[in-house]
Amino acid sequence: MNLSNHFLVAMPDMEDAFFSQSVVYICKHDEDGALGIAINKPSPITMDMIFSATGKNIPFRMQHDSVMMGGPVQVERGYVVHTPIGNWQSSIGVSDNIALTSSRDVIENISREGAVDKILISIGYSSWGKGQLERELADNAWLTVPADEHILFDIPYEHRYAAAFAKLGIDPLALFSGAGHA
């Protein structure tokens, strides 16, 4: 099972302070573990603040967009999920059209026409060690669904959790992750 380019959708009763009601975009999943970016947890940082620090112009449409809190790992670093893949210093291809980049060159070129089409910037990322995500899935902590670019880039972050459940065709209020006992 490879969950790269999938969403993890937290079960409604997840109690973890960070991951409660999270949608995590899985960028890499292999036998060594998984890496993802939470796409619906805003940080206090805006895109305008990021671009002001680089001295580059930000496309007006992104000016007030929130930077996501991608996860609790390496929160001092920025990560960019974007289309198209492009040719950046430190990127991993997630799908045929989406990449995760951690190098500054992608930020410095966003204002350049055609450098990136769609973008989600986060600070930090989410990580699971070998077998950890599989155990959490077996424990019914998460649901999975193939990623959807519309949810990832176009839907406001505060609606992404509901949109991921809608893609699954499930009402989150009807779910309970605990096993039944007779």
Curated annotation (Swiss-Prot):
PANTHER family, sorted: UNCHARACTERIZED PROTEIN YQGE (PTHR30327), UPF0301 PROTEIN YQGE (PTHR30327:SF1)
Family from the record: Belongs to the UPF0301 (AlgH) family.
Protein name, entry field: UPF0301 protein NMA1550
Gene3D superfamilies according to UniProt: VC0467-like
Pfam families: DUF179
HAMAP family: UPF0301 (MF_00758)
This protein's GO CC annotations: cytosol
Organism domain of life: Bacteria
